Amino acid sequence: MTVLDLSYNFANLSVHDLLEARDTYHYHLLSKANVVGTAIGLYLIRKDEAWPTRKGEGKTPPNKKTYARTLSNSEVRDYSWPCILAFVRSWANEDAFGPAGRYDPAQIVPKTLYLADGRAVPVCVVQADQAGSDTSATYSPPGILPAHKLGGGSPIIVRVQGAEYSATAGCLVSDGHLTYALTARHACGEADTRIFSYLRSGEVEIGASSANQLTRKPFSEVYPDFPGRRSYVALDVGLVRLDQVDDWTSNTYGLPPVGPLGDVHEKNLSLRLIDQPVLGRGATSGLVRGTIKALFYRYRSVGGYDYVGDFLISPAEGLATRHGDSGMVWHLDATTEDDAANPKPLPKRDLRPLAVAWGGQVFEESGVRSAFSIATSLSNVCKLLDVELVTDQSRGVSGYWGRTGHYSIAAFAVALVGDTDLRDFLNRNLGILSFDLDTIAEKGFDKSVGQLGDNFVPLADVPDEIWKKLDHGKNGREGGRDVSAGPHGSDGPEHPNHYADIDGEIGPHKTFRAACLADDSNLTVDAWLQYYETMAAKAKADGDEDGARRHRNKLKQGLLPFRVWQFFDAMVAFVENKDVVGFLTAAGAAAHYMGDASQPLHGSVYSDGDASRTVTRHHPRTGEDEEVSYGSGVHSAFETAMIADKAAQLFPLIKQELSGPGGHALPLLTSGKAMAKATVELMDKVAGILEPMRILDSYEQAGAGTRKATLDGMWKDLGDDTAQVMALGARYLAMLWESAWVHGKGSDIPVRNLTDQNPQDVRARYIQTSFVPSLTLDKIGDELT
């Protein structure tokens, strides 16, 4: 090449240049039968191509590879230049075109597109055969759902003409008057169609579809400064008008608190976005990760018009989007790493909501299918719908809504264990028992539990997340112990093991709880069965037939202290048999029950309100007043919503309660019956510190529900005492662990066996229904020693 020959500096090409070239050659590219789509991006270099050692070798390598370039065998390198990407069904070398070749020369895709003013735009040909997508008829959750708050990543369900359609709630937006969940239009239906979602307890009705929806817009209307004469920007975005905004958080489940909008427009949109990492949470797939592979992907042409998606996103291995993830928001990972060798954990990453996933493109290569996500700019969506991104709705709620209490009590208890070998063993396996306290206190929390599904669940939540489930069906779990399904969730023998309504008045004692503490003969199965029969007879005499039936129902007769007795016996047996996996599994699950015992509402007939009196509440959906029990809804508001919302303030208070010397400071026990009595003792202490009716009164006086004002009011009234009862729970749990360890002669177990355990070995234990079996009160006696 001489100085007089034309030389093109492709690196100077802009997004505008690339779009202009594609627009100019619109019909030319459209005529290529082998071309299935085009986009703009950076030139893809085959991964085994030698890196250039001299100037110019990047574009013209001395030993250029000629085999088919695909999305999986090529990559963007730091010297990749701007180009138009042309995706073709099949690959053919140049000698296959022409008189002696198999193909018409007119069908060859040009290497360069030349504009009238002399600019030249390179074309990168990529083999990426389109394939049909996988679909699923009904929604199936990817893992454990939130117990309480809905937010980004929650499922959106609509039923139209006998069919069910699912999508994902991407984020919250507001028009200044109302707040909406943004999702895919196809899961909204016509205006005012009722929309549903799911929490752990089952299906919930959340609102109605808005008439404000998007389908497609002319490219020139969305991007007036960019060329695109015969193109549509494809959009599939709808809004759900929420019945109760306080049921929602602006955060995405399992991700850090939502960051500022990743604002994209003609003036700042550049190819620097190529290969940038993004992540999101789909209602079907759970956590997904990917990289931006191309911009303005033309995936279809109809009647001479192109249909274009703003972003083509390549999935990370094993983390692709699926049917039901439409509406999900992709977050740009804009984190600045302080140490590249130790990247920041997910809760501390800087994520910017960037794009709404509305569709997918499945490419097939050598029989392997890869689902790429097609997404549109969230800033464009907000502009076209005339709404703004909401970032401050219940910001403190993110990650594990409803788990904070159980996990934190287990984490605090480990440090209180006196036996050095046991404490070290539990510390080494804290990730199996629970999470470390700093992780639990993070507003974003980590992603682990939210992605679990039928994989490993930290033990402190196994009784809720595994055993209180069916072992089959849409919300089933392997290892589930429930036996019947109903309109409000499933039921089974595990459920009554989590509480004991023993503050009913009986005999000379003020409560049956007091009777158990005063006389050990009341700590028997027969005495408890008689107590429930007495309560049933009393309810019937008072005209409360529902109450009478409830007290006689075996699945409603709480037996929490006997469940702790059963676990003490099991842990002792595991230690005696030197079965460290069995002991660890039982110890972690037992943390859940001792956590329940430390919550006053788990030991009270007022567990979710006082049925003897009513209050008038305004129904958010019907707009009408309704009569409900006094304190109705208090259980989840106090134990789930308030504790999760105030975790960052609560944990320092608990640490202060536990700051003195002496570990748990409780005597070690040597029998299951003594441990059951200690559990009743704990329930009595916490009821004295935080009387159940006081919780109900605070809830009603603060306005009821789970609005921020309600949670703030309850925290002001109850915060200090909540820390005190949770600290007591940690002390009694540490005492339970250490008592079983010492009584079973844990000192006989070689220290070399007290190592890090495999979570899958632990899971293999707890999915067995015979592992510390869940039994009703009338059946548990045979298990107790």
From Swiss-Prot:
Compositional bias per record (Basic and acidic residues), positions renumbered to this chain: 470-481, 491-501
GO molecular function, one term: hydrolase activity, acting on ester bonds
InterPro entries from the UniProt entry: Peptidase_S1_PA, PLipase_C/P1_nuclease_dom_sf
Coiled-coil portions: none
Region (Disordered): 470-503, 608-629
BP GO terms, sorted: defense response to virus; proteolysis
Keywords in alphabetical order: Antiviral defense, Hydrolase, Protease, Serine protease
EC category: hydrolase
E.C. number: 3.4.21.-
Gene3D superfamilies, sorted: P1 Nuclease
Function: Probably a dedicated protease for substrate gasdermin bGSDM; cleaves the bGSDM precursor, releasing the pore-forming moiety, which integrates into the membrane and triggers cell death. Involved in defense against bacteriophages. Expression of gasdermin bGSDM and this neighboring protease is toxic in E.coli on solid medium.
Protein family membership: Belongs to the peptidase S1 family.
This protein's name: Probable serine protease Ga0098714_109514
